Structures are given as C-alpha cells and as structure tokens.
C-alpha cells in the first residue's frame, strides 16, 4: 500500500510541474520575453511563483515603453506639416476641378462608361468614405506591399511620381481590424486613392479615344459617333430613321409584290409520250355531200361561218360522232338532247379531228358540251394516272360561278365513266382542293389565279401540267379583259407545245382574236349567229325614262320595277327573275329596298364571300326555297344557268354591248323563251345606241323599236363623228389599258402634290414605251406609310388646342397581320405611355385594288368619302411625336415580318402555298 501511495504522489507532483511549465511558456509567448531557467521537475512555492511573475511583468512593461518611444516622430504632426498638407489638398482640389471642366468639354461618348463606374465621395468628416469600382478590386501588389502612382495631370506631377505611397486596400467589414489600423492612416493615403480613381478614368478615356482614332477614314474624318461635330448626333438620328424607313419599304414591297414563283420549263429536256388527237372519222353520208349542200347546211344551222384551212364539215345527228354507248345514253337519255345545236354540230367534229378552235356562239347554245365530249374521248384514250401525275384536261374560266357550272355539267359524265375531276377556284379552302389533286384528278376546272397557286404549292409537288393534252379557255374574251392574260400565258408555258387548245365565248372582239391567235396553232374559227348577237328566243324590251332629276329618276325606276315584279308574279308564281346592276353598293341598296317591300330576294357580287355567293345561287336555283328574285352585278352574267329563269331586268344599263348580250343570255336558254327588260335614261346615249344595235342584229323589226330610242341613238352617233361624244367598243373601257391610265393619273397627282408638274409630259412619254401590264403590277399602287411631322394642331381633332405637333401614318395598305400588330391595344398603350403622345385611329379601310369614290351618300346627301385608314399621332413636342413614330415604325416592321412568315408557312394544315 505504501509503495503504491508513494508512486501516486510522485506522479501527481510531476503533473503539477508540467502544468506550471506550460503556463510559463504561454506567458512568455504572450509577453515575448526570455524564459528564466527552471529545472524540470523542480517544485516552486506560491511566493516564488508570484515574485517571478512580477519580475517578468516589469521587464515586459519596460520593453513596451521603449518600443513606443521609437516611432513617435512619425505620428506627431507639426504645424508646418499641417500647413503643407492643407496646401497640397487645395492644389489637388484645383486640379480635380480643372479635370472636371475638361471632361465636360469632351464628347458624351464616355457618359455610359462613367455611369458604370461608382462615384468617389470625400466626406467632411475625418474618416473618408471610399466607393470603388469592381475593376479596382484586383490590383497587382509589389513585393514591398506598395503600389506606384500613375501620372494623371502631366508633367506637373513628376514629383509625386517619385514618391511611394501605401497600397490602397479594399475596405472590409472587420470592425476590429479597422479600429486597430485607424492610427496608421494618413491624409496622403486618402489623396493617393483619389489619384488612383482619376487615373483609372483617364485610362478609360484614352482607350475610347484610341478606338475613335481607329475609326477614322483615310481623309481624317471620323466615322465614330460624337467626334468633333456637334450636329453628328442629329445626322445619326436621321440616318437611323432613313434606315428604318428603307427596311419598312423593302419588307412591304417584298410582301405586296410576292409572286407565286413558277420555274420556266424547258420542253426540249422533257420526253413527252405521244398522244392521239384525231378521234373523228367523217361519215360517208357527210363526206359525199357537195360543197353547195354543205354551205346550205351551215346556213340552216343559224348561219354558221367558218374560217381556216381544211375546215371540218358539220354533222346532223349524234350518232355521226362515233361516241361510246355510255356517253350516248347520257346525252340522249339523261340530258334529253335529241340533236346537236348549231355550235355543237360544227365544233365537236372539228375538235375531235384534233384542230385548235375559236368558237363564238350565242348564250345558251350548248358551248359547254361542245368541249366536254372531246375531252372525255381524250381521257379515255390515254393511260391512267400514276402517282405524281397531273391532269389530262384543263379548263380555265374567268369566274367562280362559271367554273362551278362547267364542273356540274361534267359530273353528268364523270361518275358513269369513272373519271375524276376537281373544281379549283379562289375564295374557298385550298386544302381540300390540294387533297383532291393528290388523289389524282384527270380534269381540272378552275380560275387562272388558283391554278397558279396550286402549281406553286409545296414547291410544285402538288400537281403539274406535263400530262395536259387538252386545254380549254371558256369565256376567253372576259378572261383577257379581266387582266388574266399574264396568268394564262404563264400556264400555257408549262403545258406541252403539241397540246390541243380550244377557246369559246359568246362574244369575241377583234383585238381579243389577235391575242388568242398567239396561243393557238392554225386555228379554225367558228361563228354561229354573228358576233355579239342576242338569241332570237329572247324578247327585248326597253323602258325609257325622261326624268331630268336623279332623285326622281331613281324613284321612277324603282316604281316601275315593283310594277314589273307584280305583273310577272301574278302570271307565274314560280317565275325566276334576275336583276342586274352596275355596282356592288347598288346591289346592296336595292336588296334593302325590295326586302322592305316584302319581296324575298338575295344578292351576289364580287364583294361577298364565296360561301355566300354559292348559297345565294343555290337558294335562287331551288324551286322550293321561296326565293325567286336575285340581284347581281355582271359577275352573274357568265355561266349562270337556272331553270325557270324567264325574266332578266337590267335595272342599270350594261356598260357595253358584249356585257348586255351576256346579261340577257341568262334567259331563253336551251330553246326556251325568255324576256329581257332594260331601264335606261334619255341621257344615256351610248347605252341606248348599244341597245338599238343589239336589237337590229337580232333581227328585231324597226317597228318594234321605240322611235325615241332611234332618235337618241342617231344624235349620239352624230356627236361621235363631230368629236363631241366618245364611243368605246367592247371591253376596252375596263381592261388592261384602263389600269395603266389609273396608274398614270395617280402618278400625275403625286407629281402635282410634290411640285413636279413640269416633268409629267416626259414621264408619260416614257411610261408609254414600257409594257402595259404585269402579272402583279395590275394592282393599284400601294401607298407606303408617311412619317412627316407637321407643326400645329390637327384639324380633324375636336379637343383643346394643346398638341403642337402631329403626324398622319397611313396603315390602310399594310397587310392585315401587320395592321393588327401595329394598332392592337397593348402596342398603342405602350407607345402612348413611353412617349406621352395621343394616338387615334382615323379614316376608313379600303380593300386592295379598290378605288376611293369621289362622293358617297350619307343621310341622303352627297359627301366626300373619308380617307384611307391612318393613325393620327399628336404630341406636345416634336421629339415626343418623333419617338412615337420610331416605335410605331418598329411595330410595322415586326408585323411585316410576321405576315411574311405566315404567308410563307401558309395555312395550318398538311399543305402550304
């Protein structure tokens, strides 16, 4: 037990000695004093330990006093030093002010750079607050921990450059460290940090100036912004406006003039399969007839006149054509055509012989069947369509209604013969038409514009015309007159040259014959009953009004119309009546008047959607619909064939005789009788002359013609001879020449507005040398938005006279999508809020290619029509209006880009155009 206790006591004492030594070691490290010698393991009493501690503390205090006395000269600042410091601070402040003054005289190019750099603030307190840029945080520190100051103000700082200053250190949030280092800071350190900040600005300024020097041209003129010229910023603003205007103009023109590109076809590089044209073998009984009997036969057939080489003789019976029994059963059984009509008797043998034909015959004479029967023989003789093949027969018409009428006639045969056909026209969904063509259509009936769309759809992969061997132009004169010649020519260039081409119409003016001969090969001309002749089955009547006042004339015409409707309604309750007017607005106004008088009726014209036009014709054609009156423009004068249509009323006289022939030709079809009544005023000398001529050509006796009409006609023709009156024949009043005249008149008006009257005669002379029309230049000129700022209050505003500047921006001619993006509520509200201007929609929207009328009726009075749709921008300052214009122009450019993108993408669906 004793040995154990002694061992424990020894270990305990050693542990205590070690602890004492450790405490002494810590004390020595803290006080940084030498350790007195103490033997290891020696035990000390409390008194000895305390005495030794006191000695160590006294030595440490003495050493601290010596250390504090050595640097005292550095901290003490004498009065002389304080004066020198004040002078130095004053000099530096003066140099800073001088530097600021120089900075204000220089370009504003560094304003953005200066805004990015945080400011350096010196407060009035003893301790400065320093704000530094992020770029100043990373500095290269020399080995001695001090940084060299850069020259700022030139040679006057040479002395300062030789001095070395403490390195500027980033402030921290360590408060203990800040408090510890406060006594070591000096005023020189503050100024040195300011020098560093100013030197940084100087370096940035020199860098910008170097960039400007690099942008100088060889002539020494700076290209960069804000160099040397005060007005250069204005020039840049003008250039930017012009650049935006050019972008807007190019995008608008590109969108307006965008064509359906059809690549030229080199027929020499395509190996076409041969095909058969001649399907007709002249019967023996026809071939044995002498020429005298053939002439007599043509005379009996309404006086058929033929012109050409080796003209085919006419037939007498359907059996002489050698048609298949299936077709014969449809003709004689279903359609109940016992014998061919005059045009059919002469035209069908000629077409089936492989000849190109120009056929002119009166309305309702069976022209459609004349080109349909040979087409069916063409298709039956050729191999079936393969995948990717286009049609074999192509029929082009000027109007949608005529295309539907022909397609309806074709359906009598195609269903029985298992022949596929497709009717393609504008105003309806193109997707369904593309789907039908993808399935394979042996016959296409359509309008030229939609046919070109289909040829260009999907980069030409929808259909092609390589297999077309039979091409028909129905109502060819109207097609050329409506400006379709470029489209028709474009289609013709894509059809094989050895095709068979057939042209039919009820009228055929001489200048149209010249155009037709360009696309025909050795044609045979067939004229039945003369050119522009009303059928003998139609009774022509004229109601002459002697009223001088327009209002009384309108009342008299409407009163006569009501009495006529009552008379024919009493005679035949199922009688269909077609009323023609000249203008779309007149059709709508007459519709309202008749509905007010409790007459059920409908109206069709070019301004209505295709679905509405189709519905109106279907209701009018139906015997159970209760609608027996249809009001129409001349759009219904072609191809409309309605059973029971016994009366045609020209409420407004036709513009020329060919149009009159087609109008009245809607009745008296297929051998049935009909009546045509024309309302005309005694002031309409030209219309009366056409009526008298038409009645004389249709063999109406002079006794049946009103003597007053003959008197007015004779007087008018005498005026034409003397030069007092002008008499235009045929379609020349509405055709391609008239479009050119409209363009020239618009340009003359613009030159007068901008003071260029002197050059008008030269300009006209040069214009006449150019081509008359183009496929996409036939439209009226599109007006580019004008962004001129006008000083003064806009006259069309009714508010107080506060807005000193305004601008009118025409948006009528922009595409619909571009208009929506420009004028939607969000876009305009942003522009108004950011610029402080007022923006208002003014004017009316006028569709493309429409002509603004000189006057319109409003509340029974003739007033000036409103201008095209535009935005009125008003502001208190010119700058506010200019800023609004810039934003609106950007919206227009954005809208044009969206419109172009949507047009290139086409409608949502499987196919694109």
UniProtKB/Swiss-Prot annotation:
Chief localisation class: nucleus
GO BP terms in the entry: mRNA processing; RNA splicing
UniProt-listed Pfam families: DEAD, Helicase_C
PROSITE patterns: DEAD_ATP_HELICASE, HELICASE_ATP_BIND_1, HELICASE_CTER, Q_MOTIF
SUPFAM superfamilies, A to Z: P-loop containing nucleoside triphosphate hydrolases
Keywords: ATP-binding, Coiled coil, Helicase, Hydrolase, mRNA processing, mRNA splicing, Nucleotide-binding, Nucleus
Start-end of Basic and acidic residues biased regions: 45-55, 84-121, 178-188, 209-219, 765-774
GO function terms (MF aspect): ATP binding; ATP hydrolysis activity; nucleic acid binding; RNA helicase activity
Polar residues bias: start-end ranges: 1-30, 68-82
Placement of sequence motif Q motif: 316-345
Annotated spans, Disordered: 1-189, 209-244, 755-774
Cystine connections: none
Domain of life: Eukaryota
Subcellular compartments: Nucleus
Motif DEAD box in this chain: 474-477
Record-listed E.C. numbers: 3.6.4.13
Every Helicase C-terminal domain range: 564-713
Domain Helicase ATP-binding: 348-526
Domain comment quoted from the record: The Q motif is unique to and characteristic of the DEAD box family of RNA helicases and controls ATP binding and hydrolysis.
Function: ATP-dependent RNA helicase involved spliceosome assembly and in nuclear splicing. Catalyzes an ATP-dependent conformational change of U2 snRNP. Bridges U1 and U2 snRNPs and enables stable U2 snRNP association with intron RNA.
Family to which this protein belongs: Belongs to the DEAD box helicase family. DDX46/PRP5 subfamily.
Identification of the protein by name: Pre-mRNA-processing ATP-dependent RNA helicase PRP5
Species of the source: Debaryomyces hansenii (strain ATCC 36239 / CBS 767 / BCRC 21394 / JCM 1990 / NBRC 0083 / IGC 2968)
Gene symbol of the encoding locus: PRP5
